[in-house]
């Protein structure tokens, strides 16, 4: 059976797509307190068979077994910056929003197929596994499903009016004795505790031996909830009035015979909204350059995941690619060590190779300590790396060793499988006042760091909650950098200016400092994606100005995503327990938009694709779930379905016209895309980017406005 027929069997669906509406602003009428009622038995006014079927599924199309591959055997963090196109059984038109959890299996009971959530939720106060379908345009529908709880310890129910995996309505049975209606709010007020607004509840005794038919009817703000034909709850709430649907459970539970229906006139309105949305996307995409292949080559045996560096290794004025393979040691990804380096041109010609390549060593879930940089200022690039407990400098053109020193002794308060530090990442700073950034910072995970000069002599060291990767901010006299790392800032001499380590309870995944307000006289701020702490903004004295708990904030970028607004905007993406949610902030950390365009992580790279001042954000190279987002979080550039790799992505100007190319690769191939049309204006946008010598899977990406005349 071909894949299209396989997906069609047992399922009818109307509409798929990314949601558009943001929750209403504070003070709006839609946010008023609901008029909640707990009701006894009443006859249903609508059956699941009435009206038009939006979707009906008995789950028979799925094969018996796990629906996702056991990603945690690989390490769920692989999806922080890698796109996995094959995550198990094809799910369409369903989706698993928590792509790092292998929560869903299918089998049969008494000859009838069922979908089962089989895990004991590891974070029940923070998230609930969801199996999702439908369209953001769906509204005024009835959703019905048969449910059999296999435990009474926690909730099982129906998700509806779904906007993101942190913003939806839930009708659930819980505790063996209660039926509950609630809305999950997108912003938490307490660390690692989901914010629920209760709408209505009623007593309902249930057990684990029977199936119960749950039904929710939506009509504008009106919500009615039924169990086995008896209406238990009714309320009015307009925070969200449309959205996707699904099932959810914090404990093992089974689901059968899922159906969504609506009146015929509602279906016509849904189709109209979807058609208008698609017409708008078609128009926007036609106005943007289309991606076309510029170059492609293979990496047989020596390819890797997102563990590469770009730089001019041989001095020819062109970028080359340095591909690193690695072998994790001791525990997960905490003590990774480099096994092979391969330098290649963008035509695929190997310049040099150091180590033994092996495709088993290509993927990673961490940073690796190597960079390309002219560390000695002689005009030629070197490769600076940690390997075999040695801090080394190699010739960029040949890979030959120029200089090395032993790594520092591992601090006594650290996890110490080795006497010497194995290294986590390398970043370059100007801490001497000499031309260029010639001092290097080397750190472990996540507590200690050392500053070396370009002769590999230790200048000073520090410790604290270092997070993943530091940021150099040039603000001192003579071009000296401040060291922004974790939730702290140091000056160039090693004095800690401020720290908020004790106030925040999860590490910083990405940090940046700058004045992004659009007012040249304004003071700079520090911004951080603080993992489960969310998105945080500090003033230059270290005081927390905004703390927005949007979930596990993983990566973010800063650029001109909204040309009509002053200053720059910050775009962040979530991962752990809230994956795929993208939030756009202004420079004051106010939320401008929030959507869930994909269900896994992304480096979320800023792309100067048009050259006219509008910056896009790259999700991934995947044909269906990837592409580029604009400042309204619309997918305005997509990639052709031409068989290209989509595991990893990077952005760089490699053709020389100031616009960015998109580099896509996996462990076997590299494809480079450029625009399908030349740039024809008198000046071109050429934003200043993070230097290539400070590359990381955990760096905040900056596209600072700058123009070039033509």
Predicted regions and their residues:
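Secretory/extracellular carbohydrate-interaction modules
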Residues: 119-187
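Surface-exposed coil/turn segments at beta-strand junctions on protein surfaces, enriched
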Residues: 136-138, 151, 205-209, 218, ...
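C-terminal segment of N-terminal export signals and the immediately downstream linker at the start
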Residues: 1, 21-53
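Carbohydrate-binding surfaces in secreted/extracellular proteins
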Residues: 59, 145, 208-234
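Beta-strand-rich interaction surfaces with strong enrichment in secreted/lumenal proteins
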Residues: 129-135, 200-205, 245
């Amino acid at each position: 059976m071909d894949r299209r027929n396989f997906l069609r069997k047992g399922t009818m669906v109307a509409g798929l797509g990314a949601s558009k509406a943001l929750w209403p602003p504070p003070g709006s009428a839609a946010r008023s307190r609901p008029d909640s009622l707990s009701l006894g038995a009443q006859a249903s006014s609508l059956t699941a068979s009435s009206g038009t079927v939006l979707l009906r599924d008995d789950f028979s199309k799925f094969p018996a077994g796990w629906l996702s591959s056991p990603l945690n055997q690989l390490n769920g963090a692989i999806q922080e910056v890698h796109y996995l196109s094959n995550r198990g059984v094809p799910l369409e038109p369903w989706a698993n929003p928590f792509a790092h959890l292998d929560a869903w299996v299918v089998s049969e009971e008494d000859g009838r197929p069922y979908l089962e959530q089989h895990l004991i939720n590891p974070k029940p106060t923070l998230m609930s596994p969801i199996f999702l379908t439908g369209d953001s345009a769906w509204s005024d529908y009835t959703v019905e499903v048969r449910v059999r709880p296999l435990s009474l310890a926690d909730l099982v129910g129906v998700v509806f009016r779904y906007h993101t995996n942190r913003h939806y309505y839930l009708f659930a049975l819980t505790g063996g004795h209660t039926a509950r209606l609630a809305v999950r709010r997108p912003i938490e007020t307490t660390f690692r505790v989901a914010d629920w607004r209760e709408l209505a509840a009623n007593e309902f005794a249930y057990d684990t031996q029977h199936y119960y038919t749950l039904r929710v009817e939506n009509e504008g703000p009106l919500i009615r909830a039924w169990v086995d034909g008896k209406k238990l709850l009714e309320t009015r709430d307009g925070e969200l009035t449309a959205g996707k649907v699904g099932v959810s459970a914090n404990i093992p539970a089974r689901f059968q015979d899922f159906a969504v229906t609506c009146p015929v006139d509602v279906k016509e309105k849904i189709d109209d909204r979807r058609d208008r949305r698609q017409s708008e996307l078609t128009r926007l995409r036609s106005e943007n350059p289309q991606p076309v292949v510029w170059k492609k080559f293979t990496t047989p045996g020596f390819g890797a995941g997102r563990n590469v560096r770009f730089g001019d290794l041989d001095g020819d004025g062109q970028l080359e690619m340095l591909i690193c393979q690695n072998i994790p040691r001791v525990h997960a990804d905490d003590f990774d060590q480099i096994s092979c380096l391969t330098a290649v041109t963008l035509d695929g010609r190997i310049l040099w190779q150091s180590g033994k390549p092996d495709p088993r060593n290509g993927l990673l879930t961490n940073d690796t300590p190597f960079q390309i940089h002219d560390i000695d200022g002689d005009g030629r690039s070197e490769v600076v790396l940690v390997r075999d407990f040695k801090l080394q400098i190699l010739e960029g053109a040949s890979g030959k060793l120029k200089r090395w020193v032993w790594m520092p002794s591992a601090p006594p308060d650290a996890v110490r499988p080795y006497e010497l530090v194995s290294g986590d990442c390398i970043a370059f700073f100007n801490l001497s006042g000499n031309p260029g950034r010639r001092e290097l910072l080397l750190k472990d995970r996540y507590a200690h760091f050392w500053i070396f000069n370009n002769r590999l002599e230790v200048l000073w060291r520090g410790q604290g909650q270092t997070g993943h990767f530091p940021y150099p901010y040039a603000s001192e006299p003579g071009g000296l950098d401040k060291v922004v790392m974790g939730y702290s800032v140091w000056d160039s001499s090693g004095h800690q200016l401020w720290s908020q380590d004790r106030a925040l309870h999860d590490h910083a995944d990405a940090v940046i400092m700058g004045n992004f307000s659009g007012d040249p006289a304004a003071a700079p701020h520090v911004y951080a994606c603080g993992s489960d702490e969310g998105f945080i903004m500090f003033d230059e004295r270290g005081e927390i100005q905004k703390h927005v708990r949007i979930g596990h904030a993983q990566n973010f970028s800063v650029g001109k995503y909204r040309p009509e607004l002053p200053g720059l905007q910050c775009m962040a993406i979530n991962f752990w327990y809230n994956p795929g949610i993208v939030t756009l902030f202004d420079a004051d950390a106010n939320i401008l938009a929030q959507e869930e365009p994909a269900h896994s992580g992304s480096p979320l790279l800023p792309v100067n694709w048009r050259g006219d001042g509008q910056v896009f954000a790259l999700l991934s190279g995947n044909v269906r779930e990837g592409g580029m987002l604009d400042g309204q979080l619309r997918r305005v550039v997509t990639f052709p379905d031409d068989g290209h790799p989509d595991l990893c992505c990077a952005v760089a100007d490699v053709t020389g016209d100031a616009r960015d190319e998109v580099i896509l690769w996996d462990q076997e191939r590299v494809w480079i895309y450029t625009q399908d049309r030349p740039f024809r204006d008198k000046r071109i946008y050429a934003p200043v980017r993070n230097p290539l010598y400070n590359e990381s899977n955990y760096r905040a990406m900056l596209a600072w406005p700058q123009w070039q005349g033509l």
